[in-house]
């Protein structure tokens, strides 16, 4: 039967409602059900449009093989939700433990690399190899042929990044490789900006604000007088980070709904704001207080990655549900925890690099007078506290708001958190652990 036409846009959570009431949830659930039917439901995903025109910066890439690398078979919703719904910790949360907690077994074929001792995490299966190979092939073709991302001497680092394995592991519910490529292009573009503007490959805190603002216009277009529009348009081709941002965003907006695209723009602005705080400390040769560092890390973190889980999954979390304070808290806790994972796994890499690199163990050691080992182990404890808080808040939200798109979004964020840890643990090209145990 034909899909019913959606009603005109309106808030599904009236202003006067300060908590999730039963009547509101019923209306939101109905609307979310209609929305999922329109975009193809949880398993299908909305079809992706053709690639954007006019983005080629080199010879055409070879013909791609069929895009329908199937998603690995996933367990039912009850199993998927088990991790979140058994997550609460602390007084007063026992009633939210809706299913018995069960740790997934460590896969027998786990890649090399060991987890940080004592770090709270959930082992995950190895990413689907067919998808990893196809995403890896396509992202390299995009980087070289469409955006001229890097010179030949950086190829080993690009390959060592293993971004295909990273994104396949973080988005297990993506219906197609095309959907996975949305996340993969953005991840590569974000790292190009970080490396070329902020860190390894010519980055500097001097003038960073100007570079980031102009690059951000590749995500959030400039609308100005006709006389000056061509100059701005030409600037989007000026360097690899802007070319990558422009192309990745053009692909993304053709697959995402307007509110999903706007969500990403705002999350990227948050990221850039965090870059600027860290740059200011570098210019002043200042080590911030621990709480100041953690505040910066709530902005300079992975947030733009898990919050596109619905677009990559082929569905949409309504904007008013995404904006709820409870959802924002869950997203912030997940993003903060995953970023400390990066601080911990990249610790030895950053110590070996020229200059002083701020990370949580370094800041704690400096500000609290602890040994390097004690500061590192305290950072592990902080990560674990944030992870438990994330799971508790996610479980509470899942129980309070049984809307399909909310449940699936929470599962997607949790999957991203787990996949992010798995990639850091297994990527021994980039990361090794300190000798603290």
From Swiss-Prot:
Which InterPro entries does the protein's record reference? Isoprenoid_synthase_dom_sf, MIB_synthase, Terpene_cyclase-like_2
Q: Which reaction does it catalyse?
A: (E)-2-methylgeranyl diphosphate + H2O = 2-methylisoborneol + diphosphate
Give start-end positions of Pro residues composition bias: 59-73
Query: Magnesium: is it a keyword of this entry?
Result: yes
Which Pfam families does the record cross-reference, listed alphabetically? Terpene_syn_C_2
Q: Which GO terms describe its molecular function?
A: metal ion binding; terpene synthase activity
Superkingdom of the source species: Bacteria
Q: Which biological process annotations from GO are given for this protein? A: terpene metabolic process
Q: Summarize where Mg(2+) binds, as residue positions.
A: 194-195, 199, 342, 346, 350
Q: What class of enzyme is it?
A: lyase
Region annotated Disordered, chain positions: 32-125
Q: What is its EC number?
A: 4.2.3.118
Alphabetically list the UniProt keywords.
Lyase, Magnesium, Metal-binding
The cofactor named in the record is: Mg(2+)
Q: What else is on record for this protein?
A: 2-MIB is a volatile organic compound that has an unusually low odor threshold. Together with geosmin, methylisoborneol is responsible for the characteristic smell of moist soil as well as unpleasant taste and odor episodes associated with public water supplies and contamination of various foodstuffs, including fish, wine, and beer.
Question: Which PANTHER family does this one have?
Answer: BETA-PINACENE SYNTHASE-RELATED (PTHR35201:SF4), TERPENE SYNTHASE (PTHR35201)
Instruction: Name the family.
Output: Belongs to the terpene synthase family. 2-methylisoborneol synthase subfamily.
Reported function:
Catalyzes the cyclization of 2-methylgeranyl diphosphate (2-MeGPP) to 2-methylisoborneol (2-MIB), which likely involves the intermediacy of 2-methyllinalyl diphosphate.
Protein name listed in UniProt: 2-methylisoborneol synthase
Please give the organism: Streptomyces griseus
Q: What is the lineage of its organism?
A: Bacteria, Bacillati, Actinomycetota, Actinomycetes, Kitasatosporales
């Amino acid at each position: 039967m034909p899909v019913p036409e959606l009603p005109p846009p309106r808030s599904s959570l009236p202003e006067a409602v300060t908590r999730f009431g039963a009547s509101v949830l019923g209306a939101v659930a109905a609307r979310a059900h209609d929305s999922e039917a329109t975009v193809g439901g949880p398993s299908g995903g909305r079809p992706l449009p053709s690639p954007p025109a006019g983005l080629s910066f080199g010879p055409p890439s070879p013909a791609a093989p069929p895009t329908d690398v199937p998603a690995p078979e996933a367990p039912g919703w009850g199993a998927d939700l088990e991790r979140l719904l058994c997550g609460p910790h602390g007084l007063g949360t026992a009633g939210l433990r809706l299913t018995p907690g069960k740790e997934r077994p460590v896969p027998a074929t786990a890649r090399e690399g060991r987890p940080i001792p004592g770090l709270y995490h959930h082992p995950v299966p190895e990413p689907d190899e067919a998808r990893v190979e196809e995403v890896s092939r396509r992202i390299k073709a995009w980087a070289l042929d469409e955006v001229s991302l890097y010179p030949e001497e950086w190829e080993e680092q690009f390959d060592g990044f293993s971004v295909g394995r990273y994104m396949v592991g973080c988005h297990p519910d993506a219906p197609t490789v095309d959907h996975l490529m949305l996340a993969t292009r953005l991840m590569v573009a974000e790292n190009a900006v970080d490396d070329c503007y902020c860190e390894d490959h010519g980055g500097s805190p001097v003038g960073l604000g100007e570079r980031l603002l102009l690059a951000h216009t590749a995500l959030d277009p400039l609308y100005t007088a006709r006389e000056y529009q061509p100059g701005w348009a030409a600037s989007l081709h000026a360097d690899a980070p802007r070319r990558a941002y422009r192309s990745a965003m053009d692909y993304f907006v053709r697959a995402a709904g307007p509110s999903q695209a706007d969500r990403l723009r705002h999350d990227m602005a948050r990221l850039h704001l965090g870059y600027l705080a860290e740059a200011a400390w570098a210019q002043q040769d200042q080590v911030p207080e621990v709480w100041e560092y953690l505040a910066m890390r709530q902005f300079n973190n992975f947030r733009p990655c898990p919050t596109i889980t619905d677009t990559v999954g082929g569905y949409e979390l309504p904007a008013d549900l995404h904006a709820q304070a409870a959802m924002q808290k869950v997203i912030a806790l997940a993003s903060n925890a995953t970023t400390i994972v990066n601080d911990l796994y990249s610790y030895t890499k950053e110590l070996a690099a020229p200059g002083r690199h701020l990370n949580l163990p370094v800041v704690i050691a400096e500000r609290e007078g602890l040994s390097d080992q004690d500061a590192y182990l305290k950072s592990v404890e902080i990560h674990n506290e944030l992870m438990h808080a994330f799971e508790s808040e996610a479980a509470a939200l899942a129980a309070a708001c049984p809307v399909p798109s909310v449940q699936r979004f929470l599962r997607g964020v949790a999957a991203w958190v787990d996949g992010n840890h798995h990639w850091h643990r297994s990527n021994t090209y980039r990361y090794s652990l300190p000798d603290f145990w």
